[in-house]
UniProtKB/Swiss-Prot annotation:
Record-given protein name: Subtilisin-like serine protease Cur l 4.0101
Protein family: Belongs to the peptidase S8 family.
Superkingdom of origin organism: Eukaryota
Keyword annotations of the record: Allergen, Glycoprotein, Hydrolase, Protease, Serine protease, Signal, Zymogen
Record's signal peptide: 1-15
UniProt source species: Cochliobolus lunatus (Filamentous fungus)
Domain Peptidase S8, first and last residues per copy: 147-453
Residues of the propeptide: 16-135, 459-506
Active-site positions on this chain: 183 (charge relay system), 215 (charge relay system), 381 (charge relay system)
């Protein structure tokens, strides 16, 4: 489905995406389509029924059908140029998928091959492949201050002049944890990663092992950068599923999820065999989204079932996140965006599929173009990596799997529940009643996971009135602090200028 890297700023009005189902014969597998996404012509994702154990015979069969139909078209074209025979070249089988709960494949097939697939007894359903892209992409202004988002997740109450640029954290946060950033890639040579970022996999065929867009690098920096990251010791693996223009296909995204899940499983096995010292687990971030995709949601849920802790962006359409994927994947942590002024960001999706909020407006992080590049952009794409980093941060506070003090794994389900339980309740304004008003919290710098969890949640104090706030600000008159005060006031003003950050769109 059209996948938009959920970053920067969206168009505000969006129709709720829905599925349409095509059935020609009663016994044929249905073909699912999203009415809100731009389809990739003749490209499909095929999902097997639960009884299928060994898919290799089916893969051989579908390739033979594809080859036979291709040969017949070529023969027809040779016989007569007057016949209405397609000149399109169909690529055949593209990816195979094998995750717990999801087994299938994708490919580029003609209509005859598609009909044969639909009538095969192994096939549960077929989903039309569709485009994915970055959500937004406007070039925003850049602030030179430390990210306010890091400060916000480490403080319970609204940020003030004294706390707005102070991030409290455990020094070893992220140590021993791998984070798979499924995006446009990562500028792995950026100095902020200190050599902890590596290239994992490029899924789009023929694309370079580089981030030509910047979005993935920005997300990776928020996850694990030395200066800009939540979990400053975590290791990042770039999983490129979108091209440099920020777009791609659903089938490539699903393959990227599979790569991350299998890489995590391999890391677990290596740790058990003593080949990956100090390993504590894996998280993943996916700041992309679009129309509803049953296949992508199933892939994410399967990856979580395999032990991969997953954060996904809620979306930037100011609409119900349940109508978007992967935001609707129930096993993942679905993240909405908040502002410096403790509001729900005006673009952030909402609804019962949202699990938590994190900073997402005017977020400073790493960028492409040099080893020192930075950029400030906005979106739920920027909120989600705060949570992916926080999941890694929390995992790192546990003993390593090969340690004599190792404890039972914190399952993704348990850590998700704990993350929500310790969040700051009622922190934000403009949150619909059907949406959890919970802002992420990292424990305020504590390195004791048990202590953080036992502290539980927190309900914010009533915010000061505008008059009280103005009076308090007026009394800050210490000359040596005036420059910092100006920075804070400018940041607050910037957070309130909605139109400025969407290229003038209201």
């Amino acid at each position: 489905m059209k996948y938009s890297l959920i970053a920067a700023l969206p168009a505000l009005a969006a129709a709720s995406p829905t599925f349409s189902t095509e059935t020609i014969h009663k016994q044929s597998a249905p073909v699912l389509s999203s009415t809100s996404a731009k389809e990739v012509p003749n490209s499909y994702m095929v999902v097997f029924k639960k009884h299928v154990k060994d898919a290799s015979k089916h893969h051989d069969w579908v390739q033979s059908v594809h080859s036979k139909n291709t040969q017949e078209r070529m023969e027809l074209r040779k016989r007569s140029s007057d016949l209405p025979v397609s000149n399109e070249v169909f690529a055949g089988l593209k990816h195979t998928y094998e995750l717990s709960g999801l087994k299938g494949y994708s490919g580029h097939f003609d209509d005859e091959t598609l009909e044969a697939i639909r009538n095969h007894p192994d096939v549960d359903y077929i989903e039309r492949d569709s485009e994915v892209r970055i959500l937004g992409g406007d070039e925003p202004e850049t602030e030179n201050n430390s990210p306010w988002g890091l400060a916000r997740i480490s403080h319970r109450d609204s940020l003030s002049f004294g706390t707005w640029n102070k991030y409290l954290y455990a020094a070893d946060g992220g140590e021993g944890v791998d984070v798979y950033v499924i995006d446009t890639g990562t500028n792995v040579d950026h100095v902020d990663f200190e050599g902890r970022a590596k290239w994992g996999k490029t899924i789009p065929n023929g694309d370079a092992d580089e981030d030509g867009n910047g979005h993935g690098t920005h997300c990776s920096g928020t996850v694990a950068g030395k200066k800009y990251g939540v979990a400053k010791k975590a290791h990042v693996y770039a999983v490129k599923v979108l091209r440099s223009n920020g777009s791609g296909t659903m089938s490539d995204v699903v393959k990227g999820v599979e790569f991350a899940a299998k890489s995590h499983s391999e890391a677990v096995s290596a740790a058990k065999n003593g080949k990956k010292k100090g390993f504590k687990g894996s998280t993943a971030n996916m700041s992309l989204g679009g129309g509803k995709s049953t296949t992508l949601d199933m892939a994410v849920n399967a990856a979580v079932d395999a032990g991969l802790h997953f954060a996904v962006a809620a979306g930037n359409d100011n609409a119900d996140s349940c109508n978007y994927s992967p935001a609707a994947a129930e096993n993942a942590v679905t993240v909405g965006a908040s502002t410096l002024l403790d509001e729900r960001a005006y673009f952030s999706n909402y609804g019962k599929c949202n699990d938590i909020f994190a900073p997402g407006l005017n977020i400073l992080s790493t960028w492409i173009g040099s080893k020192h590049a930075t950029n400030t952009i906005s979106g739920t794409s920027m909120a989600s990596p705060h949570i992916a980093g926080l999941l890694a941060y929390m995992l790192s506070l546990q003993p390593a799997k090969d340690s004599a003090y190792a404890v039972a794994d914190i399952t993704p389900k348990k850590l998700k529940a704990n993350l929500i339980a310790i969040g700051t309740v009622g922190a934000l304004s403009d949150v619909p009643s059907n949406t959890a008003n919970v802002l992420a919290w990292n424990g305020g710098g504590s390195s004791n996971y048990t202590d953080i969890i036992e502290k539980g949640g927190y309900t914010v104090k009533k915010a000061a009135s505008k008059e009280e706030e103005k009076e308090s600000e007026f009394r800050i008159t210490i000359p040596s602090l005036s420059e910092l005060e100006d920075d804070f006031e400018k940041a607050k003003e910037s957070a309130g200028r909605k139109a400025h950050h969407v290229g003038g769109k209201l």
